[in-house]
């Protein structure tokens, strides 16, 4: 349950709840996140807890409440300084954690939340957590088909063929082609939207081209294969390394120790996309037709550009 009302953001989940003894430290002290508990939570975005601690420090009001098996603890802060600490027993609430905060206007000045941006983030979480319902300001969001739903909801035109949806251990992909130009990708790592891509997206782009060329036994130019593509990839990586704290670009070379990201993605698509195209001959025919059209258009444009350069060169020679 998520709400933004009068500039106060509130989030209530229904998981296990933060251990009551650790609640205050978990939201205010560094190096107290889940990663410091051993081998658990390896395929997560972080769990160092830096984000929640930063929000605490930069909020004029911050509340953390955890409920576990009939007991609860509520801790409040202001600018990161503890204000109160309350323990309760005999609580008839579902287990879970509640966080609310009001950003400090002395730090940020006047501000407003972009609710459309928040809504899109929530939609992304639904695609990656099948069947999990997110409630935001009175509206509910849930996905039953994962990345396939993402593609269907983000395409602005009818796809040339039914979107391809493939999934396996630690990977899920969805692929379609439209009639536009360029390439469009949505990539995720351990539930985090990587808007600037990274090693997983680079491997995905390479794998699509490699698999398609091998399927048709044609040495197509990769750009002709990928032009007009809209696709999504989600991978689960052990101890992911991002290129910045914002975690919008993955830098990990391996998906897990000893397994390279490139080989993992290339091998997955090499098997599953190839199998799909063999089983869906109509899709394979439509895709090949699109590739050939892209090739003709690219060569035609290249020819026009070459002629224009030659004309300009002749013109300069006569000046």
Report each predicted region and the residues it spans.
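Short conserved segment of the HATPase_c
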Residues: 18-33
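GHKL-family ATPase ATP-binding module
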Residues: 1-14, 36-37, 43-44, 49, ...
């Amino acid at each position: 349950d998520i709400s933004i009302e009068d500039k106060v953001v509130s989030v209530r989940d229904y998981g296990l709840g933060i251990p009551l003894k650790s609640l205050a430290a978990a939201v205010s002290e560094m190096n107290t996140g889940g990663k410091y508990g051993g081998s658990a939570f390896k395929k997560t975005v972080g769990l160092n807890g830096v984000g929640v601690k930063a929000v605490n420090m930069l909020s004029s009001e911050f509340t953390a409440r955890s409920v576990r098996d009939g007991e609860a603890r509520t801790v409040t802060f202001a600018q990161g300084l503890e204000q109160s600490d309350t323990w309760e027993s005999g609580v008839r609430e579902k287990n879970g954690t509640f966080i609310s905060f009001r950003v400090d206007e002395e730090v940020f000045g006047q501000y407003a939340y972009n609710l459309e941006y928040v809504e899109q983030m929530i939609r992304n979480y639904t695609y990656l957590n099948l069947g999990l319902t997110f409630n935001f300001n009175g509206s509910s969001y849930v996905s039953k088909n994962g990345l396939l739903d993402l593609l269907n909801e983000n395409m602005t035109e009818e796809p040339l063929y039914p979107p391809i949806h493939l999934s396996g251990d630690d990977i899920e992909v969805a692929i379609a082609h439209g009639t536009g130009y360029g390439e469009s990708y949505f990539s995720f790592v351990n539930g985090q939207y990587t808007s600037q891509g990274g090693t997983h997206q680079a491997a995905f782009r390479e794998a699509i081209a490699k698999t398609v060329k091998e399927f048709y036994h044609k040495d197509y130019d990769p750009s002709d294969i990928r032009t007009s593509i809209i696709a999504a990839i989600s991978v689960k990586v052990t101890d992911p390394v991002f290129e910045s704290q914002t975690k919008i670009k993955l830098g990990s070379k391996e998906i897990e120790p000893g397994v390279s990201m490139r080989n993992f993605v290339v091998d997955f698509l090499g098997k599953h996309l190839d199998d799909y195209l063999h089983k869906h001959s109509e899709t394979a025919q439509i895709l090949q037709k699109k590739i050939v059209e892209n090739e003709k258009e690219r060569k035609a444009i290249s020819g026009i550009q070459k002629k224009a350069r030659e004309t300009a060169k002749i013109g300069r020679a006569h000046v």
